[in-house]
């Protein structure tokens, strides 16, 4: 694998977001403020994107990341739905995920470059990742105040996507054959979903106040 500082930085920030999420749930022994629906969507993203994990070896780095994303995502769902189920805020976590999944399936069949199962699933995962955070954002909007570790988790998720945009720009400038408009568009949409969140997160840090969404 060619060393790419921007991609590695993005991946490290993504891992940091997972650390914040699991630390919040395990150390506080609750999943208050965490959307189970978003976590399920992210798990679907990783499963459909990494169908080739058992037969397509690109690099040890890539394989380790795939395993980490799959296992931590499944573990997070277990913690929310089983171990700390009594603290799950199902009253506010109400977005119907099928409103996100079905359009992504349709778009995957329209925009896939190859009608193989792995390619259709990969394309589907790109679309779904762009909107998987929506249940989480809507849950936080409905409750208002955001816990510290929750805010760090979501901030890192947004930063990870922003760093990937820089990575794409870098690759486009340095690799002649690099062309991935679908990834760029979906990744940009995903990053835009975090813009308002970034604003209020940074504002609360600068002012030393609690992080509250309007």
From Swiss-Prot:
Pfam families membership: ER_lumen_recept
Intracellular or extracellular location(s): Endoplasmic reticulum membrane
Source superkingdom: Eukaryota
GO cellular component: cis-Golgi network; endoplasmic reticulum; endoplasmic reticulum membrane
Keyword Transport: yes
Parts of the chain that traverse the membrane: 5-23, 38-55, 64-82, 99-112, 120-139, 152-170, 182-202
Membrane topology designation: Multi-pass membrane protein
Keyword field: Endoplasmic reticulum, ER-Golgi transport, Membrane, Protein transport, Receptor, Transmembrane, Transmembrane helix, Transport
Cytoplasmic side: 24-37, 83-98, 140-151, 203-214
GO biological process: protein retention in ER lumen; protein transport; vesicle-mediated transport
Ranges in the topological domain labelled Lumenal: 1-4, 56-63, 113-119, 171-181
Keyword Membrane recorded: yes
Family to which this protein belongs: Belongs to the ERD2 family.
Function noted in UniProt: Required for the retention of luminal endoplasmic reticulum proteins. Determines the specificity of the luminal ER protein retention system. Also required for normal vesicular traffic through the Golgi.
Name listed for the protein in its UniProt record: ER lumen protein-retaining receptor
Protein source organism: Entamoeba histolytica (strain ATCC 30459 / HM-1:IMSS / ABRM)
Gene expressing this chain: ERD2
């Amino acid at each position: 694998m060619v060393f790419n500082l921007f991609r590695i930085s993005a991946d490290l920030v993504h891992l940091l977001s997972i650390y914040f999420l699991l630390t919040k749930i395990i150390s506080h022994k609750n999943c208050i403020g965490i959307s189970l629906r978003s976590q399920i969507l992210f798990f679907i993203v990783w499963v459909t994107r990494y169908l080739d994990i058992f037969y397509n070896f690109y690099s040890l780095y890539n394989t380790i990341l795939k395993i980490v994303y799959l296992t931590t995502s499944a573990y997070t769902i277990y913690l929310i739905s089983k171990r700390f189920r009594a603290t799950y805020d199902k009253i506010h976590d109400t977005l119907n995920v099928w409103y996100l999944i079905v359009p992504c399936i349709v778009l995957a069949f329209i925009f896939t470059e190859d009608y193989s199962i792995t390619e259709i699933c990969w394309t589907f995962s790109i679309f779904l990742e762009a909107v998987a955070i929506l249940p989480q954002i809507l849950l936080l909007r409905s409750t208002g105040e955001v816990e510290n570790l929750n805010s760090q988790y979501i901030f890192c998720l947004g930063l990870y996507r922003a760093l990937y945009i820089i990575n794409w720009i870098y690759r486009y400038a340095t690799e002649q054959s690099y062309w991935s408009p679908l990834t760029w568009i979906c990744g940009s949409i995903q990053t835009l979903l975090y813009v308002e969140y970034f604003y209020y997160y940074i504002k609360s840090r600068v002012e030393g106040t609690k992080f509250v969404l309007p």
